[in-house]
Amino acid sequence: SNGKESYSSAEKEESGQPLQSASISASSSVESAELAESANAGYPTLKEVAQNYNGCALEYPNMEELSVGMLYGDSGNRYCLFDVDGRVHHVFESDTYIASGFYNGMCMTSTRVMAKEDGTLFRPSYLSNDEIIIRYAKDDDGTLLWTVRREDSIEGTKAIITAWDTNGEIRFQCDTTRDEFSKMNSDTVYKDLANNDYDSIGISQAFAYCGGSVYRIRSDFYYVFMNIDTEKFFSVREPNAYLIQAEGNLMIRTMPGLRALDDDFNELPEWEAIKSRRSETPVLSEGLIYLDVRRDADDFEDYPSGFYDVHLNQVIDLSQYNIQSIYEDEPRFINGYAVLQMKNPEGVPFWGVIKRDGTWAAEPQKGSVRYVYQTAEGVLITTCEENIEQWYTYDQTGTKLDEWDRIKFDGSYGYAQDSSSGNRGICEVYNGYTYASLNSHVAKISSDGSYEYLS
């Protein structure tokens, strides 16, 4: 039968069943993979469903439970939920916009309500009516649902910000009566958070995740950063941008000016008067950061191009190379490998892969890198020859993958973020495979570069 028929019959069967029997939630213990497989067998495959569409993309991966995909159609796009075997559990109506990954039996829609596996819209029972959902994501501290509500009294208005864990217990809570919020207007904070733009990672975003256990609130020109593990807060007024990246218990500030911070958000003294020679934003990854900086103080000091730790100790010297960003993405380590885009003295582009010990995993070769994707053991690098649409894909050793000729990743150029970064991850490494969008299909890719399409 064609995909349409089998799908609609599966939909009819599914609608007659209670939700529990139709699905196995990730939290229940599955005795065996066969049991899960048989429970999912009633669902149509992504390949069957995608036949009626022009293509499919991975939007919010969570292969452990269900992933959010996007089906592209002439009459509009539709979100869907599918499992690791590529079976489609639900296709949403075209007017439903999914704005988070699917965790613990639910995902968030753009109208600030949650959707179940069968598409039912609901609000978690532990939320009072005046709580507005502002973020739902799986971050380093686990899956958290963030809300804001306001309390008005004759003394004044306050906004209360709460993070709920998957049991509906309060994991973290604070309100705008804290000193750090004293320069902000509580009414404005509430309105900014209630209208938070959930899927952008822009400077003006009212509520943002910075990595690690650090979150940020922005209102007017004030920022409040909070570490929900240490319960430490930090506030600052900055008319431009104030950006912090956290990795584990390490933090760097990338704007205004480059600094490393301690657990209390104090600047580390060794970063005093440091100025970058590059316009791109560096990235702290696997404890190292690529820098080309100088100290503009009485004792002028040079920190040439290379990888450094957060105390400005140079780990790898790259000063003999002309290091380029990859579409504004600076070099970073992924699985112990850093992909470097370089130019020779005549301006010809070369790329190579360096290991943490500073030796080459892949010697420099000609080409311009377009994509870098994480695999279970290394990275995949897609290059494109200048002026001709000829795509090549390599592993971290520089070995060309012949079966990848003329196919490429979908999405914007640069480094693909694993979904664990809390941002809109466009790939996920799960059980030894990378799941990503490839040539308008959802693909399952192994570390050796072999792949299969799920859609």
Which ranges hold each PLM region?
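Gram-positive cell-envelope targeting signals
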Residues: S1-S27, E31-E34, S38
